[in-house]
Amino acid sequence: AAAGFAGITMPKEYGGQGLSPIMQVIYNLEEGNFIAPRGVYEIGLGMCIPTMLAYATEEQKQRYATPALHGEEIWCQLFSEPGSGSDLAGAVTRADLKNGKWIINGQKVWTTSAHHAQWGLLLARTDWDLPKHKGLSYFVLDMTQDAVEVQPLKQMNGHASFNQVFFTDAVIDPEFQVEGLGDGW
């Protein structure tokens, strides 16, 4: 982690190498010659942190990118829902602003590594009056709060890398919103 190999293309100021995508390909080919498990870090390093680097505030980038790249924090994506699967526009998990905080209610499914994650990148509906491709917002969710229940989904082989995640009045402070309100699509 200290050498920045977890983030070959990610900026140096956040713990990456700041190299080109072709260098990432070369590294991946070389890494393939060894047993180098990435497992629970793959979603965070491959999807969540790149999204944060593209759309988050500078404060959010500083707070979340470096610990993830150093293997100190695990992330999951909270996107797919029962009844909508990969149709993200069909999301019905709610984020309602009450007393200056976002209150989250709903469910996600097929969430890889949620049972290990400290943080989740959450897509939730913030405006029900808009068409389904609008009114969606991104948030950073603290997965360790009591209002978040993670249930691993056992596969036929006995492993459980996927999960159902339930939110019952989970709380998110406004500074954990990523990008603008309604900019989740």
Short names for language-model regions:
Residues 71-79, 123:
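A short, Trp-centered hydrophobic/proline-enriched beta-strand micro-motif
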Residues 1-2, 101, 180-185:
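Short, intrinsically disordered, charge-balanced linker/junction segments flanking boundaries
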Residues 73, 89-91, 115-118, 135, ...:
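A generic structural signal for well-ordered coil/turn residues at beta-strand boundaries
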Residues 23, 144, 151, 156, ...:
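A glycine-rich, basic-preceded beta-loop-alpha segment at the flavin cofactor/substrate interface
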Residues 41, 83-86, 110-113, 128-130, ...:
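Short Gly/Pro-enriched turn/cap motifs at secondary-structure boundaries
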Residues 91-92, 100-101, 105-151:
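A short core secondary-structure module
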Residues 2-72, 112-119:
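Internal helix-loop-helix
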Residues 4, 27-32, 123-124, 140-145, ...:
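Short Ser/Thr-interspersed hydrophobic loop/turn segments at strand-loop and sheet-helix junctions
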